[in-house]
Structure formats: structure tokens, C-alpha cells
UniProtKB/Swiss-Prot annotation:
Component of the large ribosomal subunit. The ribosome is a large ribonucleoprotein complex responsible for the synthesis of proteins in the cell. This is Large ribosomal subunit protein eL15. Component of the large ribosomal subunit. It holds the Pfam family Ribosomal_L15e. Keywords: Cytoplasm, Ribonucleoprotein, Ribosomal protein. One of its GO terms (biological process) is cytoplasmic translation. Belongs to the eukaryotic ribosomal protein eL15 family. GO terms for cellular component: cytosolic large ribosomal subunit. It comes from the Eukaryota. GO terms for molecular function: RNA binding; structural constituent of ribosome.
Length: 204
């Protein structure tokens, strides 16, 4: 096994004494830093490489702190107006994962970079910490490499805002196999529309 395989096994055993200590110390360190800051290198090089990171020019890592828990509806004094069925303020669950929220915040802060992917690096009772891989699409090392030219296209701008990253697709219910029947045809809405539309063909 290579070194990265050993690192992967270390991260799989998060309840081991070594990892419990490491994660505890790192969470303390991340709490002292700002909620969004640039990391000099990936905390999990094995995971970052599996998600497309390369230790070369044009690749940037940002570490994001996201507050855990549900989403409170932002209404003044709890006044939602309308019918009682929509009066909920506190027990609202956000449709997307905290990881996709972290990607969105990184993408907003670094508008000139493209979000490639992200991964979990730690959590405590209040926060979750993610590292987001961003790519500078105007760097020659990225533009001249056939493997990374796809992300330099204009259509890839703000992938994280449109649910096109891995974390974003997960909350949209997209995937392959028998677990993803609800999105056959592109999306939940497309699948629902097809199943609930009566088609009366002329010759039937």
C-alpha cells in the first residue's frame, strides 16, 4: 500500500486515540481563526487528491467554518404572514447540506476562482469545518492542461451556486443506481412531471 492508502485508513478510524486527539486539537485551532480563511495546504492530502487537487500552481485551499443546526426562517418578530401551515420559524430544515453551504460561501468570497470540490475536516458541538478546493482558471498551468481545461469554460462559473458540485448533486437527489429513481429524467421535478402528466397520443 502507498502512503495515501495508510492516511485514508487513519481517517476512517476517527474514534482511535490518535485521531480523537488530532481532531480535538485541530477544532480548537480552527475556532480561533476566522470563519473563512486560506489554508497553506490541504489537511487531508489523500482526500484532496481523490477529489481532483494537485500540488501545483493554480490550486487553492480555503477552510470554511459553518454553524451547525437547523435553519431559522429570517422573518421580523416571527411574523411570516399567510396561512398557519406556513407559520413555522424555528424547526425549519435547510434543503442543502452544510458542506454545500461552505462551498457557496467560498465561491462568493473568491469570485474569480472556480469551486472544484470540498471535504470534511472536523466538527464540534457548534461548528463543522470544511476545506474547499478552488481553481484559478486564468493561470497558464490550468489553461494549458487538457485535464483541467473543462473548468475554465464560462459555463462552469459558480458551479457551487447551481448544485453542480458533488455535495450539491447529493442534495438534488442525483446519482446512478436503484437509489436514485426519483430523479430519472434530470431532476425531481422532471421525474414528477413526467409521472403525473397524462399523454393521450393520437394513435394509441
Amino acid at each position: 500500500m502507498g502512503a495515501y492508502k495508510y492516511m485514508q485508513e487513519l481517517w476512517r478510524k476517527k474514534q482511535s486515540n490518535v485521531m480523537r486527539f488530532l481532531l480535538r486539537v485541530r477544532c480548537w485551532q480552527y475556532r480561533q481563526l476566522s470563519s473563512l480563511h486560506r489554508a497553506p495546504r490541504p489537511t487531508r492530502p489523500d482526500k484532496a487528491r481523490r477529489l481532483g487537487y494537485k500540488a501545483k500552481q493554480g490550486y487553492v485551499i480555503y477552510r470554511i467554518r459553518v454553524r451547525r443546526g437547523g435553519r431559522k426562517r429570517p422573518v421580523p418578530k416571527g411574523a411570516t404572514y399567510g396561512k398557519p401551515v406556513h407559520h413555522g420559524v424555528n424547526q425549519i430544515k435547510f434543503a442543502r447540506s452544510l458542506q454545500s453551504v461552505a462551498e457557496e460561501r467560498a465561491g462568493r468570497h473568491c469570485g474569480g476562482l472556480r469551486v472544484l470540490n470540498s471535504y470534511w475536516v472536523g466538527e464540534d458541538s457548534t461548528y463543522k469545518f470544511f476545506e474547499v478546493i478552488l481553481i484559478d482558471t486564468f493561470h497558464k498551468a490550468i489553461r494549458r492542461n487538457p485535464d483541467t481545461q473543462w473548468i475554465t469554460k464560462a459555463v462552469r462559473k459558480h458551479r457551487e451556486m447551481r448544485g453542480l458540485t458533488s455535495a450539491g448533486k447529493k442534495s438534488r437527489g442525483l446519482g446512478k443506481g436503484h437509489k436514485f429513481h426519483l430523479t430519472i429524467g434530470g431532476s425531481r421535478r422532471a421525474a414528477w412531471k413526467r409521472r403525473n402528466t397524462l399523454q393521450l397520443h393520437r394513435y394509441r
